[in-house]
Structures are given as C-alpha cells and as structure tokens.
Amino acid sequence: MFNFLIKANHESESKKTELLLKNGDIIYALSSTSRIDFQALKIFTKQNNLTELELKNEKFPIKKNYFQIRNPKRRFPWQTPKRMHSKELGILAENRNFSRNAIIIPVDVFWGKSPERQDNWLKLLFRESWEGTSFIRNLFKLLFNGRNVKIFFHKPLEVDDIFNSPESDKNLVLKTERLLRARFRKNRKAYLGPDISNRRTLVTSILNSNSIKNYIESESKGNKKTTTKLRKKASKYVWEICSDMSYPFIYLYDRALTWFWNSRYENLEVLNFEEIRKIAPSTSLIFSPCHRSHIDYLALSYLLYYKDLMLPQIVAGKNLNLPLVGPLLRKGGAFFMRRSFSNNRLYSVVFYEHLRKLMQRGHSIEFFPEGGRSRSGKLMPPRPGIISMILRSFLGMDEKQVSFVPISINYEKVLEGNSYINEVMGAEKKKENLKDIFSVFKDFRNYLGEAYLQFGEPISLNALLEEYPLDDFSSEKDWLFKVTPVLGKRIMTNINNSTVVTSTALFSLAILNSDGFSISKQELVSRIELLKSLLKEKKYSTKTLICEKTGEEIIDQMRKLGFLSKEDINDRISLTNLE
C-alpha cells in the first residue's frame, strides 16, 4: 500500500555477501519483526533483482525464505518483558541436515541514517535511534524517512559450526538468537553509537561505582555527615562532566553544518578513512586529532556522521562550558574536563570512573593530545594527563579491542588566525569568553578555501599492552609514567606523518626569506614550484600530501582567501599589504 513511499540504498559487509544476494537459495534473518522493515527489504530486493522475500518456498523446511528475530513482549505494563523465540529457527534446529548447508544472511534496516540532506525538521525527529518503536512511530518513520532507508547485509552465519553442535534444539535456538542479536547490536552501535537516551542512568552508575564508594568510605571514616557531603560533591562533579548527547539536536547540527561546509569551504577532503571503517565494528575508537581551531570539533563529528559511524564523546576544556555554548556542546557529545585537578582527589576519581564507563559501554572518544589549539601549524608536545587516564581506564578490560586513531586536520585558512597573530606580537592569551567565540563567526561570511582530514595509522592499545605488559598492579604508577610518553609520541608521530602541505603553507614559506618589501610574481611562482619539487623528492612520509595547485593557482587562492590585497594584480606583489 505504501510502497511508493520507500526508497532504499544498501551496504554489504563483504563482496561475498554481495554475490550471494543473487543466489536464490538464501534465507534472510531480519533484526526485528517490524512490518516496515520487512516491506523495505521486500521492495529493495525486488527493485534490484536480488533474491526476493517469499512467503511460500517449498525448498526450505520453514516454507519461506526469511525469519525475524522477535523482541521481548509483555501483555501488561507492570509485567517483566518475556523473551519470544523465532518459530522458524526452531524448525531449522530440527532439520539440521538442511540447516548446516543453508546460507543465512542477517539483515539490518536503518531509517533516515543515509547522508542525504534533510529538508524537513520532522524527518530529523523520526530517524533511526535506540528509542523503542511503536505503530505510531513506525508510521512517522515511513512517512518522513521512507525515501531515506539504508539496508545492511551482514556476512552469512557460520551455519556449519552452529548446526553441527550436539546441543538440544532448544539450546541451539537460544545460541543462534544470541549470536544474531550480538551481531545486530554491534552493527547498530557502529552506526548509532551506544544508547545515550538516558543521561541520568550513566550518572547513577558512576556514583554507585565501587571506586567512588570506596573513596568516600575511606575519607568519611564512617561519619554520615561527611559521607553525605562527599556524595553531593561527587554528584555535582558528575553532572559537570557528563555530556547530554541528543539525536534531534545532532540532526539539526547536521543541517546547519551542511550549509556551512557547502557555502564557505571549497572542499572538505577526507583521506585514508576506509581502514578506520573496516576496524570500527570490532574496535572501540579513540580519535586523537591535532588541534588547530574550534572548527575541529565540528569537522570530525560531521564527517563521522556522514560516514555512518557513531559520534564520539568529545573531551572539552571546562573553559568552554560557558552559558549558551556549554549546553549546545553537550548536546553534540562534549564532556568537560578541568584543566588541572591534581589537588582534587575526588574529582580525579569521578573523572576516571566516567571515562571507564564510556569505554565499558563501547563509546568512541575524541580528545586533543596537544591539550590546546596550535594555530601556527606546528604540533605541540602531547599532554600526558588525558592519555594516562585513558590507559588507566583500559586496564582490566583486556578483552575489549581499543585503538587510537591519529588525525591530521589542516586548513587553508584558520578562523582564529587573527587572535594568534596578536599573541605572537606580544598580546597575552585571553581566557575563552562568549564575545571572543562569537567574534569568530564574523569570518563565516568569507571564503575559507579547503580543509583536509587525513586519518593516520591506528595504534592498537591491546598491542601496546603486549609490548609493555603490566605484571603487577602495585607498580601501576611507574608503568603509567613509562608508557604514557611512549603512546603520546606515537600518536603525534602518526599525526605528523599524515600532514597535508596546504597552498597557504607553501605561499608562506616562499615569502618567508624575501629581503625586500615586494616580490615579483614570477619569482614567487618559481619559489613555490621549487618548494613543491623538494617536498616531493624528500617526502617526509608516504602519507604526506602536497598541494597539487600550480604556483599561479596558489597566488590566486591567496587572493580569494583575503591574504593578498586586491591591489596586487600587477607583476609585483607587495609584502606590506599581506592581510
């Protein structure tokens, strides 16, 4: 009836899966009993000449070529939800001779997670999320996001291992359902991130953690008044730290940032991302970009959103927790960290426990190893504090796969360039305030050129622990003192290896040793070309990218960016008019 409302695209976990989809002897395993998910898959397979869903198929014991994983249900609101089992899986368990040779492909259906731009705020509210579904919600998903559906085909189940098991039919059904749910949950988490719908639950779990309870008990020494006081203080710290990520807000950010990137930047170039996509479903990612500008937060989150990876929880300095700005950043996933808390043991315990809970729940995390913005383009030494805390949080969770992802972010024009020039000229660095942050927006009206995000070689935390094992937890402090700088150096090295030499960098270097107040255009072009040839001949690393524009094009780009006066249209370029 509503077929005309549904338009889907798809992604397959492997090339083998893609080929098998045209094999008529496959069985689909849907992640839910949703009728609109079923309808979307039915329409998509028919339109793309893939194996269609069949309600009657005599070749299979289940008499059709699909089954659906059933969600827990309850008849009355006060009842505990009861786990429901797939009847079709029970039949497959009874017919093991058939099932061990069957091709079973699990299927996920996502509504509104495709990277097309939304043109209606209602679409933003009824995209895929962790929230429960209902008839009304499904109807709105169909109406507002039916043209924006993504279908994900997993690799086939390992039926030979499953159905050769000596277990009873009942246990086999339970085992297969657990396996399927784990796959669906992992894939859903990779696309949406962990369930963030209840901030209070996270806060409560942190406050009830053993580390905080033990600290309060040791400090209060049984004094109820002191215990209450410390617990209130811990609660205050947790609420101060935690993010408040909101899907509707994120979708609205998407619309605003799409306008910003498309209207102000010539290009947002993404390099070496595919390796990160490959490891994302099985690995918790800790994004570690260099820090040039406040735009860094937006650029990386925007990219991950459009690449269909979970948005990270972002470590932000408490100096950004300003009125109006702070709540908006929290909605986008930022959590706040004080610059120094070495003398506040309770805050340290709370922050550590918060970080540990994020890692346990499978959140990806983003932090800036330099600690502050380096607008000069030169990387600063890594700050050991947050790196050390992440290492501590990971100890005891060896079964989790965690990787640091170094990222080099480069701009042709940095928005905060003027404030940096003032600091170089002797002005003191100001504390962040609303006026300074909003003053950056005045440059939003201007052309900002190109931006580059290049992903460096991931660093496996598991491999690092094998290289530097901690044999005795009593020596944890010495171990951290030894390993933290090693990890920090590797992150910064991989960022540096992935740098992009922009047109602005080439232009700046070319005029740096000019001995007069002007330079001929011909001389400037030849200097730029010489620098490019030297950089290519003595490339810093295989991942280093050098601007491909010619010398003439780079000079034109500097005019567009506003660095050269419009008066410089003759054969000589004045170096006193540089802006």
Residue locations for each model-derived region?
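Membrane-interfacial terminal anchoring regions of lipid-handling membrane enzymes
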Residues: M1-E579
